[in-house]
Each structure stands twice: as C-alpha cells, then as structure tokens.
C-alpha cells in the first residue's frame, strides 16, 4: 500500500530554494485550498532573487493573472541569469514566457525576436514557431506564417 500523502511544509519552514520551488509546483498543480504557490515562490525569491526557476514560475503566476508587465520583469530576470555564462541556455522556457508577456502587452516586435530565441530550445520549438506564425499572420506576412506554422506542426 502506498504511503499517505504528506502535507507541504510552510514556506518559512523549507530549508532550500529547491524545496520552495518544488512545494510551490505541487501546491500549484493540486490547487491546495489553503496553501498558495506564490507564497513559496516569493519566499524563494526573497532568499535568492536571481533563481531562474523561481523567477520563471512566479512570472508564470503573474502571467495567469494578466499582470503582463509584472510577469515580464521576472521572466527578464530568469533570462538574464540563464545567459550569464552562455548565450544558449539550458532551458528556453523563460524566453518563451517572456515572449508571451511581451505579446500580451502589445510589444509584438520585441516578442517576435524573443520567440525566435525560444525556438532554439527543443521543447519550445513547436509553441515558439506557432507564436511566430500568429504574429506573421497578424502583420500580413502570410508566406512566413505558413512556413512557421508548418515548422510548429513538424515539431509536435
């Protein structure tokens, strides 16, 4: 018989930023009635304001609440640190999320450039190419839109 589930520690009782990140994801995934993932992410960011994972997931929380400018700040922090030592980061999710936050603010030219960077990462190629196709179509570049949507489909 499996072990019964254990309650998440309170944010202030977590020892590491990794614990805060993982408990926050758990609370977010299972929509706990009394715990809030933001509390875990913010405690982690209080301890380490440069943590890529925490900046990205907290930005995602703000994105879901339509605080696009607020989300942009956290995604930028995640991107900045992820390319501190290498122009090609391990994970391109912060780039993709930054692109979304820019697009939703009407900063479509900048979003386009950021989505182009996001397609360098394997897991964000399909959604990144899709977003490029949408922006191409919106500006009447239909040949490019078709090319990008086909690339998106190929990478599904």
Task: Describe each region flagged by the PLM.
Residues 18-19, 53, 93, 127:
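Start-of-helix register in tetratricopeptide repeats
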Residues 47, 80-87, 121, 154-155:
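Structural marker of alpha-solenoid helical repeat scaffolds
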Residues 25-26, 60, 100, 134:
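Residue-level recognition of tetratricopeptide repeat
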Residues 30-31, 65, 105, 139:
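Structural motif corresponding to the intra-repeat A-B loop/turn of tetratricopeptide repeats
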């Amino acid at each position: 018989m499996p072990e019964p589930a254990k309650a998440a520690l309170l944010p202030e009782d977590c020892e590491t930023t990794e614990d805060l990140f993982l408990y926050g994801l758990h609370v977010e995934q299972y929509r706990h009635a009394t715990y809030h993932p933001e509390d875990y992410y913010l405690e982690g960011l209080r301890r380490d304001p440069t943590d890529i994972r925490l900046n990205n997931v907290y930005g995602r929380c703000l994105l879901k609440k339509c605080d696009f400018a607020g989300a942009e700040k956290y995604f930028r922090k995640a991107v900045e640190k992820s390319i501190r030592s290498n122009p090609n980061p391990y994970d391109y999710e912060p780039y993709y999320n930054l692109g979304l936050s820019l697009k939703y603010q009407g900063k479509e030219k900048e979003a386009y450039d950021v989505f182009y960077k996001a397609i360098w990462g394997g897991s964000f190629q399909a959604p990144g190419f899709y977003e490029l196709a949408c922006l191409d179509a919106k500006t009447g570049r239909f040949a490019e839109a078709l090319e990008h949507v086909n690339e998106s489909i190929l990478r599904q």
